[in-house]
């Protein structure tokens, strides 16, 4: 039986080695579009040209960020070029979050999270894109999940970083309202992205993003996006029961890679999401020694995982795992379940020892095993 996969990897080279990190926010060889939808205008940035019938990689950022600060460090990373030469990339900025965005008029009703997801089909139609492989972080991961649930025929795969499938509870909602009266919105956003350990230890990274959130993002528009995210509904996804028709279960049908740093504030939410998804096509990647922005601070390991993911979908089969080969001397304990997802098959080919299996309820697709991964 296919099993769920839970992997821990370690990356030892930080990306932000300059104090301001601004070079990592730059766009290169991109085209920008403002596309009108039923729920308002959306700003998108295209990098590269679509390759035949291949899907495009579509990204959606988290609150307090835009596509530049959320993803450019990852896509500008050297090893990612092996992927981007095979795929066009479409970065989507939530309304009013792009660089230089003007304030919305007084009384403007910001789209709900569900409406933000429904802004994506017109984007694909306008750009003549047939399907996507989505990469979302936080709020963006939620939006792409909702999009995939509503339009499964348009989504071939998802990489969901720090995803929270749950609605905000009323206690959390009240606490956020109270904290909003007493706390700077920048601090609220930072605590969403980073845990206390990272806030105190990684001062250069925190300062880079503190300045970005405060100076580069329109504060009024940010408050609206934050309010929309805090008002999200539960995704209401559920794990299929063995023997039950998958069409009767509300779950993601595409290959899905869940990613979270082991010290991220989102760990519990991602684990909860993991428990609701079908283990046949889901992989959980828990990155060791990593905080809230794995695509920024550990791009090498995330790139490697993404390559495996794409290989399992039948793309870039000749992609070399050079970073894995270079770091084979660093061994980490990992909790893995071998599914038929991209990452699972590739990791399984690099195992050296046997497995230890734990018993689970037989009617739910949720068995686990422990392996040693050299990476």
UniProtKB/Swiss-Prot annotation:
Species lineage: Eukaryota, Metazoa, Chordata, Craniata, Vertebrata
GO biological process: signal transduction
Modified residues (N-acetylmethionine): 1
A single Gene Ontology CC term: cytoplasm
Compositional bias (Basic and acidic residues): 364-375
Record-linked InterPro entries: AB_hydrolase_fold, NDRG
Composition skew (Low complexity), residue ranges: 330-346
Pfam families the record matches: Ndr
Designated gene of the protein: NDRG3
Modification type Phosphoserine: residues: 331, 334-335, 338, 341, 352, 361, 374
Gene3D superfamilies: alpha/beta hydrolase
Keywords from the UniProt entry: Acetylation, Phosphoprotein
Protein name: Protein NDRG3
Ranges of Polar residues composition bias in the record: 347-361
Family of the protein in this entry: Belongs to the NDRG family.
UniProt modified residues of type Phosphothreonine: 322, 329, 332, 355
């Amino acid at each position: 039986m296919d099993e769920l996969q839970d992997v821990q990897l370690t990356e030892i080279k930080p990306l932000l080695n300059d104090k301001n990190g601004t070079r990592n926010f730059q766009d290169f060889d991109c085209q920008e579009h403002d596309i009108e939808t039923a729920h308002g205008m959306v700003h998108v940035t295209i990098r590269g040209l679509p390759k035949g019938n291949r899907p495009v990689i579509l990204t959606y950022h988290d609150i307090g960020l835009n596509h530049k600060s959320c993803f450019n460090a990852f896509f500008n990373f050297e090893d990612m070029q092996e992927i981007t030469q095979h795929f066009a990339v479409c970065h989507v900025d939530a309304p009013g979050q792009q660089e230089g965005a003007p304030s919305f008029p007084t009384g403007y009703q910001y789209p709900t999270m569900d409406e933000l997801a429904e802004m994506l089909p017109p984007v694909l139609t306008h750009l003549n894109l047939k399907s996507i492989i989505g990469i979302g972080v936080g709020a963006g991961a939620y939006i792409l999940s909702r999009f995939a649930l509503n339009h499964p025929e348009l989504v071939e795969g998802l990489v969901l970083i720090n995803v929270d499938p749950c609605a905000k509870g009323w206690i959390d909602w009240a606490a956020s309202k109270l904290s909003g009266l007493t706390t700077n919105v920048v601090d609220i956003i930072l605590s969403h992205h980073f845990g206390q350990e990272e806030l105190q230890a990684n001062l250069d990274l925190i300062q880079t993003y503190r300045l970005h959130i405060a100076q580069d993002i329109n504060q009024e528009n940010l408050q609206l996006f934050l309010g929309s995210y805090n008002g999200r509904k539960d995704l209401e996804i559920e794990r299929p029961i063995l023997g039950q028709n998958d069409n009767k279960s509300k779950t993601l049908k595409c290959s899905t890679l869940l990613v979270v740093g082991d010290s991220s504030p989102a760990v519990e939410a991602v684990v909860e999401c993991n428990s609701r998804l079908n283990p046949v096509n889901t992989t959980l990647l828990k990155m060791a020694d990593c905080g809230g922005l794995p695509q920024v601070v550990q791009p090498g390991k995330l790139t490697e995982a993404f390559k495996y993911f794409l290989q399992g979908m039948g793309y870039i089969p000749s992609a070399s795992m050079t970073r894995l080969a270079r770091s084979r001397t660093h061994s980490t304990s990992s909790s893995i379940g071998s599914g038929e997802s991209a990452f699972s098959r590739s990791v399984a080919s690099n195992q050296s020892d046997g497995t230890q299996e734990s018993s689970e309820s037989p009617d739910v697709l949720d068995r686990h095993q422990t392996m040693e991964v050299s990476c």
